[in-house]
Amino acid sequence: EAVDKAAERVATKLTGSDRVRAAIGGVENEGRHVRFANMPELRRFDELRQELTLSSLAAPETQTFQMMLQLALARHGKLLDATLDLGRFQSDAARDIARLGLANYFAGAAVMPYSQFLQAAHDTRHDLELIARRFGASIEQVAHRLSTLQRPGAKGIPFFFVRVDQAGTITKRHSATRLQFA
C-alpha cells in the first residue's frame, strides 16, 4: 500500500490535458533529461548521462507510463527496495525482476490512482474504453490495473487479465486472485 500511496502523490501532478508534458516535468525535476527518438524499443535510460530516451513511435499513454516507471526507479528506489526487503528472493536476478515489476506497478498507480480509478470503474460499470479515456491510459493498462485492485476495505471485483496473440497463445496474464490456466 505504501507504493500505491507514493504513486498517488505523484498522480496529483499529472493533471491537465497534456499528461506527457506533465510527466516530462516530473522526470526532469529529478535531474534527468527526457528526449524522444525514432527507435523500436519503448525506452532506454543512459545512466551516465542521466537521459531517458522514449520512442516517438509509442502512443502518448505509453510514453507517460514509461516516464512514471523511470520516476519510480529514480525518486522512489528506496521505497521499492524496502518493499522488496519483505520478500524472500532466491537470487539477485529474481529480486531485480521483482523490482522492475514493482516499478511498473508504481507507474500504473501514478497514471491511475487507486481511489479515483476504483470509483471510475464502478461509475462506468468497468467499461475499459471509458476508463482508458478518463485516465489517458491504454486498454491494456486499464485491464492490468483492474486486476490489481485488492486494497483491504476497498477491493475491486475479481478481474482476470489475459492477452492472447493471433495464434491463441497467452502472451501475458495477471490477476491478484486465483485463476487456473490449463
Tell me what each language-model feature is:
Residues E1-A182:
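Short juxta-domain linker segments that transition from a proline/glycine-rich
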